[in-house]
């Protein structure tokens, strides 16, 4: 039997469990098999700054006195990753075509999620929870609301950065480059290399974490950086097992027994897709049906040595614009590129359907992912709203955000955003309602109704199912939104809605008149 004990005078020895011996957060150690290699990852609290928690291992041998365990420290690692020497770059994404119409007036990372958060809060919070507080956010299309949210939440929202900073870098036209828009993920970083390089040198940055702003997951990035350091990798790609239905939407990787990436293909199809199948039996401890996940996909999360990043963007691959489609397929041939498999919950919010499903999944029991974790909280803009007010309502499997006002309504399997108003007799099922960023008083609501207008929120006796309702939408009385004809794709912008993958999407600030049937 073995024990793990933090090298802390106030800590006590606790049993070490291998995968399968314990469940959930009770596991203190898990083994991750990559091919023929076994990588041991200690699940322990890391000290931010210069200190790092170490461990001692107690081993009972056949001749040992079991009443007097002998401790020996473990010194297999020579270098520990220091969060103070790590910087993060969060890519704000492109035009957000796949999430349209939710991205018609906002950047993808600014899309509301989980009732009161924005997608940008996911990588930002993961950074803070990992001890990484030197962050750059690259923005481009429809970035006004994203910039506003970042400012309110992270630049003026009370989060203490100590020696850290958050800087927003918007796409800018340069004198020698008439086309100011980012041409790809690598080009986005390259265009601001003059700012980044100066920052890296001043702060002794050794490693750079590159992140996406359109994913839902919880990760300690310093665990990824530590593996990057242990492997002495030039580039480390965070990967996840996926099924065949989505494989062609991602960059796929193959790696050898040491975890070194030997092949990278961006969004392969046909024979190329088939050639990227791998034996995922090494994930049997984490995946029930390993045959369902025959591919390993890049999560779009990378760790690079600072010097390697500067070299590939300024010199070696200065003409290439994108990491996934151009740089990584070449880098695996010329650099030490390693894979790190992530088996916890991860969802790429790349389409209306995946966005819708991921939000509603938050209401299921037990949920695959939840925002409730006091040790690794997710931050968002402080709004100082009152608690939700519910009068004679029936609520089942739902998330209700602050500031809501419900009266004698029924809500099931739905996520309701901040400051939402749902009136008497309403029925909502399988609905993602983003809420409102403004209040209309009872007097204002009564006046609008008297004038034959529609106030913000949902009017009396309205029935809604399988729907996304964007911010500040006005839905009248006796409306039915159910898509009973099963239409998959349809555009009705003049009427205030679209249909994507069979899901009705009510536009931001749209007005749906009384008695409308969709």
UniProtKB/Swiss-Prot annotation:
InterPro entries assigned to the protein according to its UniProt record, in alphabetical order: ADP-Glc_PPase, ADP_Glu_pyroP_CS, NTP_transferase_dom, Nucleotide-diphossugar_trans, Trimer_LpxA-like_sf
Presence of keyword ATP-binding: yes
Catalytic activity: alpha-D-glucose 1-phosphate + ATP + H(+) = ADP-alpha-D-glucose + diphosphate
Regulation of its function: Activated by 3'phosphoglycerate, inhibited by orthophosphate. Allosteric regulation. Inhibited by inorganic phosphate (Pi).
GO MF term list: ATP binding; glucose-1-phosphate adenylyltransferase activity
GO cellular component: cytosol; glucose-1-phosphate adenylyltransferase complex
Pathway listed: Glycan biosynthesis; starch biosynthesis
Family matches, as PROSITE patterns: ADP_GLC_PYROPHOSPH_2, ADP_GLC_PYROPHOSPH_3
Pfam family, one: LbH_GLGC
Phenotype of the disrupted gene, per the record: Shrunken seed endosperm due to a strong reduction in starch synthesis.
Quaternary structure, from the entry: Heterotetramer composed of two small and two large subunits.
Family listed: Belongs to the bacterial/plant glucose-1-phosphate adenylyltransferase family.
Role noted for this protein: Involved in synthesis of starch. Catalyzes the synthesis of ADP-glucose, a molecule that serves as an activated glycosyl donor for alpha-1,4-glucan synthesis. Essential for starch synthesis in seed endosperm. Is essential for both catalytic and allosteric regulatory properties of the cytosolic heterotetramer enzyme.
PANTHER family for the chain: GLUCOSE-1-PHOSPHATE ADENYLYLTRANSFERASE LARGE SUBUNIT 2, CYTOSOLIC (PTHR43523:SF1), GLUCOSE-1-PHOSPHATE ADENYLYLTRANSFERASE-RELATED (PTHR43523)
Name this polypeptide is given: Glucose-1-phosphate adenylyltransferase large subunit 2, cytosolic
């Amino acid at each position: 039997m073995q024990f793990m004990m933090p090298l802390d005078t106030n800590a006590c020895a606790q049993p070490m469990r291998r995968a399968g011996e314990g469940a959930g957060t009770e596991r203190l150690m898990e083994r991750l098999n990559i091919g023929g290699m076994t990588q041991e990852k200690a699940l322990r609290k890391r000290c931010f700054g210069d200190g790092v928690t170490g461990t001692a291992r107690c081993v009972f041998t056949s001749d040992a006195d079991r009443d007097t365990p002998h401790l020996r420290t473990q010194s297999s690692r020579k270098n520990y990753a220091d969060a103070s020497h790590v910087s993060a770059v969060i890519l704000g994404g492109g035009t957000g075509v796949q999430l349209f119409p939710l991205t018609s007036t906002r950047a993808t990372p600014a899309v509301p999620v989980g009732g009161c958060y924005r997608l940008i809060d996911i990588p930002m919070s993961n950074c803070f929870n990992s001890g990484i507080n030197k962050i750059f956010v690259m923005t481009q299309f429809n970035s006004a609301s994203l910039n506003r949210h970042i400012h309110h939440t992270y630049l003026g929202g009370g989060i203490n950065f100590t020696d850290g900073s958050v800087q927003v870098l918007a796409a800018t036209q340069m004198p020698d480059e008439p086309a100011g828009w980012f041409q790809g993920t690598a080009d986005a970083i390259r265009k601001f290399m003059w700012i980044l390089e100066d920052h890296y040198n001043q702060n002794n940055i050794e490693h750079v974490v590159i992140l996406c702003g359109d994913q839902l997951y919880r990760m300690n990035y310093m665990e990824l950086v530590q593996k990057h350091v242990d492997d002495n990798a030039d580039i480390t790609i965070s990967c996840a097992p996926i099924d065949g239905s989505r494989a062609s939407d991602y960059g796929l990787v193959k790696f050898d027994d040491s975890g070194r990436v030997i092949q990278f293909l961006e969004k392969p199809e046909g024979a190329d897709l088939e050639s990227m199948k791998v034996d995922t039996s090494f994930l049997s401890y984490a995946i029930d049906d390993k045959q369902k996940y025959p591919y390993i996909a890049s999560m779009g999360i990378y760790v690079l040595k600072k010097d390697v990043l500067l070299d590939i963007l300024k010199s070696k691959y200065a003409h290439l614009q994108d990491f996934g489609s151009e740089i990584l397929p070449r880098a695996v041939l010329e650099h030490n590129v390693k894979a790190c498999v992530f088996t916890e919950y991860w969802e790429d919010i790349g389409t209306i359907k995946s966005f819708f499903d991921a939000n509603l999944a938050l209401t299921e029991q037990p949920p695959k992912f939840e925002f409730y974790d006091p040790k690794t909280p997710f931050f968002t803009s402080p709004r100082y709203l009152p608690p939700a007010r519910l009068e004679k309502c029936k609520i089942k499997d739902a998330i209700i955000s602050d500031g809501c006002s419900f009266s004698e309504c029924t809500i099931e399997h739905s996520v309701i955003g901040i400051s939402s108003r749902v009136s008497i007799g309403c029925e909502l099922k399988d609905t993602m309602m983003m809420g409102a960023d403004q209040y209309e008083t009872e007097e204002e609501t009564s006046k609008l109704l008297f004038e034959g207008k529609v106030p913000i929120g949902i009017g009396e006796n309205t029935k809604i199912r399988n729907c996304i309702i964007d911010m500040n939408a006005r839905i009248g009385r006796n409306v039915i939104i159910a898509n009973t004809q099963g239409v998959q794709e349809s555009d009705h912008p003049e009427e205030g809605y679209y249909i994507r993958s069979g899901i009705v999407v009510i536009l931001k600030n749209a007005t749906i008149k009384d008695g409308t049937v969709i």
